[in-house]
Each structure stands twice: as structure tokens, then as C-alpha cells.
Curated annotation (Swiss-Prot):
It is found in: Cell inner membrane. The complex is composed of two ATP-binding proteins (PstB), two transmembrane proteins (PstC and PstA) and a solute-binding protein (PstS). It is a peripheral membrane protein. Residues 19-258 form the ABC transporter domain. Its EC number is 7.3.2.1. The lineage of its organism: Bacteria, Bacillati, Cyanobacteriota, Cyanophyceae, Synechococcales. One of its GO terms (cellular component) is plasma membrane. Part of the ABC transporter complex PstSACB involved in phosphate import. Responsible for energy coupling to the transport system. GO terms for molecular function: ATP binding; ATP hydrolysis activity; ATPase-coupled phosphate ion transmembrane transporter activity. It is an enzyme of class 7 (translocase). This is Phosphate import ATP-binding protein PstB. It comes from the Bacteria.
Length: 273
């Protein structure tokens, strides 16, 4: 199946919800990395995943467009619904999932191609037949990097600074017209000025896309997100590892100013993490 549209499913699902995680447990071999996650990610908002290292937040993020399929031994129980359709259903094409739900990684990773082709290449292989020049410009503008790139579109993407490369990667993701954009610590390798540009870009992008971001920077979560999910991890009984779990999911203002769980209060106040 190469489409995620199933009329019988989309009739009943909540259109305000972009992604619905229902009792999701993700394992690597016999090790449960994160378990029993229930979460509804709202459409047209920025949702932040926060928590200490090893709590499973990036694992959950990558499950939202099946990037974890590329990791040997990784498996998922439960369901993730997108438009009322289970992304892990037996007839779902993972490539189509990744077109509809794009991802931007921690380290900028432009293609070894020109700036122009970084945008055009993915659109072309996904069947885009419109005005490519217009698409390239529109995508670069949406990612707030057009002014830096417009006079050197034929130069290598590697000629850009780190922050510009990351915005180029965002533009590349936008070009294939996804509905959701996942961002896995997109600013962790960037300087403060580049980070600010990415954050400003996110505020504009949420007018057109649903965004889910993993960040270790709690101030960033406060600045950019509408909703925040706090993950934590606990030691496995009788084992040596830790299993991640979702502690609390709420409006960002409530998570940081009036959390319902003591563990959330301890984390956002800097008592651990």
C-alpha cells in the first residue's frame, strides 16, 4: 500500500490530532527501551520531547516515521495512528510514511550536491512535476535561508555554515511537502545565533506543518513549543539497563510552571537530568 489514506479510518479520527500513540513499547532485541506510551500530538503545533539522556525520547521520535525500522532488532508494540491509519499496519509502505512525516537530524547532513539539487533531488524522485525553480525558492524561503543561498544555488551545500546547512536540510524536508516535521535535537551542534534562526524558523513553519522536536535544552522547549512531553527512565528490575516512559504530557506552560508530577517538577527545576 503506497497511500496512508483509508476513508473508513479517516471518517472517525480526531482531525485536531496529527499523531496518536497508543500503548507504544519499543524494544531493541529483548531490551525494552521505552514502554507504554500514550500520547496525542496536536496538529499545527510544536510539541517538544524533553527528559534526561536514555529516557527514550529520540527513540519515540524516530518511531513516528519508522526510522527505527532501519535499526536491526528494533520492534514496536502498540500502534501509532496518522490520519486514523496505523503506521505500522502490514500494508503500509515505510517510504511513503517518511515522505509524509519528514525528519531533520541532530547533525546537518546536506547531500553532496549543489544547494539547488539538495532541494530538487528529493522532490524529483517523489514525482514532483511542477516548476522546480519556484519550489526551490519557496522551500528555501520557508526555511529562512533563501537570502544566504539565492546567489549561489549551484554551489555545494557544504559551502554553507553549520546553521545554514541545517536550514538547508529543513528546506529539503519541506520540499517533499510532508504534513509533519520531526526534529531530533536540531540545534545541539549550532552556535547561539544559528540556534535563534532555527527557532524563529520553527515559529513560521508551524503555520503550515506539525512539528515534533527532541531537545535537551529546556529553555528552548519553553521558547518554541506549545506542548511538552516529559520522559524519564527507571532501572529495570533485576537488570542493568533503564526503560524509558512518558511521565507527563501537557501544555508547555503547565509543564514548566504547574506540573502535575513530582518527577516533572524535579526535572524542570534542575534537580536531576
Amino acid at each position: 500500500m503506497t497511500t496512508l489514506q483509508q476513508p473508513q479510518a479517516t471518517e472517525s479520527h480526531n482531525t485536531d490530532v496529527a499523531l496518536s500513540l497508543q500503548n507504544v513499547t519499543i524494544s531493541y532485541g529483548n531490551f525494552e527501551a521505552v514502554k507504554n506510551v500514550y500520547c496525542e500530538i496536536p496538529r499545527g503545533k510544536v510539541t517538544a520531547f524533553i527528559g534526561p539522556s536514555g529516557c527514550g525520547k529520540s527513540t519515540v521520535l524516530r518511531s513516528l516515521n519508522r526510522m527505527n525500522d532501519l535499526i536491526e532488532g528494533c520492534s514496536l508494540k502498540g500502534s501509532i495512528l496518522f490520519g486514523g491509519v496505523d503506521l505500522y499496519g502490514p500494508k503500509i509502505d515505510p517510504v511513503e510514511v517518511r515522505r509524509r512525516i519528514g525528519i531533520v537530524f541532530q547533525q546537518p547532513n546536506p547531500f553532496p550536491k549543489s544547494i539547488y539539487e539538495n532541494i530538487a533531488f528529493g522532490a524529483r524522485i517523489n514525482g514532483y512535476t511542477g516548476d522546480m525553480d519556484e519550489l526551490v525558492e519557496r522551500s528555501l524561503r520557508q526555511a529562512a535561508v533563501w537570502d544566504e543561498c539565492k546567489d549561489k544555488l549551484n554551489e555545494s551545500g557544504y559551502s554553507l555554515s553549520g546553521g545554514q546547512q541545517q536550514r538547508l536540510c529543513i528546506a529539503r524536508t519541506i520540499a517533499i511537502q510532508p504534513e509533519v516535521i520531526l526534529m531530533d535535537e536540531p540545534c545541539s551542534a549550532l552556535d547561539p545565533i544559528s540556534t535563534l534562526k532555527i527557532e524563529e524558523t520553527m515559529h513560521e513553519l508551524k503555520k503550515s506543518f506539525t512539528i515534533v522536536i527532541v531537545t535537551h535544552n529546556m529553555q528552548q522547549a519553553v521558547r518554541v513549543s506549545d506542548m511538552t512531553a516529559f520522559y524519564n527512565a527507571e532501572a529495570v528490575e533485576g537488570g542493568t539497563g533503564k526503560v524509558g516512559y512518558l511521565v507527563e504530557f501537557n501544555d508547555t506552560d503547565k509543564i514548566f510552571n504547574a506540573p502535575q508530577q513530582q518527577a516533572t517538577q524535579d526535572y524542570v527545576s534542575g534537580r536531576f537530568g
